[in-house]
UniProtKB/Swiss-Prot annotation:
Cell compartments where the protein resides: Cell inner membrane
Organism expressing this protein natively: Escherichia coli (strain K12)
Annotated InterPro entries: FecR (IPR006860), FecR_N (IPR032623), Ferrdict_sens_TM (IPR012373)
Protein name: Ferric citrate uptake sigma factor regulator FecR
Stored Pfam families: DUF4880, FecR
PTM entry text: Sequentially cleaved starting with cleavage immediately after translation to generate CL(a). CL(a) is then cleaved by an unknown protease in the periplasm to yield CL(b). Finally, CL(b) undergoes intramembrane proteolysis by RseP to produce the N-terminal cytoplasmic fragment CL(c) which is released from the membrane and binds to sigma factor FecI, allowing it to activate transcription of the fecABCDE operon.
Stretches in topological domain Periplasmic: 99-317
């Protein structure tokens, strides 16, 4: 038993885990939404318990999924870890596995960001480490190398010249990236790493096949798993707009726009499949997702309905 939990909060956590499983399913009916809202509003312990779900999702850095079919846009891996985290709060032994996992390491990392937060850190060598929303990284410098371990989320690196000429490396679950220049971003997804190079080049070694390597040059983007490289593609400048505290979209499907917003906004943001293909262009302040939703409502034939402060539906007019 967890002595910090009252019986009512323990029951609320059990109910929250049930509702999380329901709302992260493939189909969520209006009746289920209404019942969740009723449950959420009827008791402060329920609101506290749901906040624990949100906190776990924020820390775990869930990657947005199919916004048209998943209420909370969480990947299967994220859903599993959230449920384990709730077990941990309930005092169940199985939750300990979360803290022994790489995600658990991330929860104790040197640098972490919550949802909607971008953080900039100047490292001891003068390099700049920028963490995107819901990200975690450890930094280790020794006499031989400078290393950043990305546990989850996304980081941007601007390297500084090192008097000791130590290599600057980023480690992810899928491989090792060595800076051959000054500016690049790295995003940790469930089963692959996304690398975007803005200046100079980055060398990539695969975790399961270190003999294989790939050089990614400025203006290029690469996805890779632990065992194979994807195709090198031209860099999409919009993908790195967050480093300037903005979100930029150029003729993007509304479904993709909403998937991006869910990374920065707490709660449930649902997009009806009937409007997911509408296109949006614009540049918006990253910290004001309400402004983006207002533009969507004003420029596209959609209706934006606030079920609660933390639940918004986007549907056809």
């Amino acid at each position: 038993m967890n002595p910090l939990l009252t019986d009512s909060r323990r029951q609320a956590l059990r109910s929250a885990s049930h509702w999380y499983a329901v709302l992260s399913g493939e189909r969520v009916s209006p009746q289920q939404e209404a019942r969740w809202q009723q449950w959420y509003e009827q008791d402060q312990d329920n609101q506290w318990a749901w906040q624990q779900v949100e906190n776990l999702r924020n820390q775990l850095g869930g990657v947005p999924g199919d916004v048209a079919s998943r209420a909370l846009h969480d990947t299967r891996l994220t859903r599993r870890h959230v449920m384990k985290g709730l077990l941990l709060l309930l005092g169940a032994g199985g939750g300990w596995q979360l803290w022994q996992s790489e995600t658990g390491e991330g929860l104790r990392a040197d640098y972490r960001t919550a949802k909607g937060t971008v953080s900039r850190q100047q490292l001891e060598d003068g390099s700049l480490l920028t963490l995107n929303t819901q990200s975690a990284a450890d930094v280790r410098f020794d006499a031989h190398q400078r290393t950043v371990r990305l546990w989850y989320g996304e980081i941007a690196i601007t390297t500084a010249k090192d008097a000791l000429q130590r290599p600057f490396r980023v480690l992810t679950r899928q491989g090792q990236l060595t800076a051959l220049g000054t500016e690049f971003t790295v995003r940790q997804q469930d089963n692959f790493t996304q690398l975007d190079v803005q200046q100079h080049a980055v060398e990539v070694l695969l975790a399961s096949a270190p003999a294989q390597k790939r050089i990614v040059n400025a203006g290029e983007s690469l996805q890779f798993s632990a065992s194979e490289f994807g195709a090198v593609k031209p860099l999409d400048d919009e993908s790195t707009s967050w480093t300037k505290d903005i979100l930029s979209f150029s003729d993007k499907p509304l479904g993709e726009v909403i998937a991006t917003l869910t990374r920065y906004r707490n709660g449930v943001l649902r997009c009806d499949p009937a409007v997911a293909g509408l296109r949006l262009s614009g540049t918006f302040p990253l910290k004001n997702t309400d402004a983006i939703l207002n533009v969507i409502a004003q420029t596209l034939p959609v209706k934006i309905q606030s079920i609660t402060r933390y639940w918004i539906n986007i549907s056809p007019l």
